[in-house]
């Protein structure tokens, strides 16, 4: 899994705001080349099948802060999207539409195939397991 370079710069210059922006999760096959240098959504290598549509589906970001003995941790998690039908995907991209909106790349480690419902299960929304954590 990768946090994209555009996430870091977007947080610093205000172009990515988890509290107000709209985010999407797109699925990709093993033909996609996604990593921390990914800057935006791409149709190259995107998955298909079932009721999955190009560009993916909207996901809701939840921002929280927890106090620790060393200060505080702000963390962000996203809703767990699902699609019906047969879909095979190797990973996903969470992004804000437009240029330089890539947030993070999820690598499933191997192709995952569903025959009924394909769900990207996000981790628990806690300071120790949320998808993105700023310490």
Q: What positions do the PLM features span?
A:
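Small cysteine-rich, disulfide-bonded extracellular modules of the LU/uPAR three-finger superfamily
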Residues: 1-90, 97-135
């Amino acid at each position: 899994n990768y946090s994209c370079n555009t996430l870091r710069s977007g947080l610093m210059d205000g172009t990515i705001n988890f509290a107000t922006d709209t985010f999407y999760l797109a699925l990709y096959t093993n033909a996609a080349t996604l990593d921390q240098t990914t800057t935006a959504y791409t149709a190259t290598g995107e998955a298909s099948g079932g009721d999955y549509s190009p560009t993916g589906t909207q996901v809701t970001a939840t921002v929280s802060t927890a106090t620790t003995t060393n200060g505080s941790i702000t963390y962000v998690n996203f809703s767990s999207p699902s699609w019906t039908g047969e879909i095979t995907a190797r990973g996903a991209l969470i992004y804000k539409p437009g240029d330089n909106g890539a947030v993070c790349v999820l690598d499933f480690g191997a192709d995952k195939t569903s025959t009924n419902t394909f769900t990207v299960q996000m981790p628990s929304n806690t300071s120790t397991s949320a998808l993105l954590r700023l310490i």
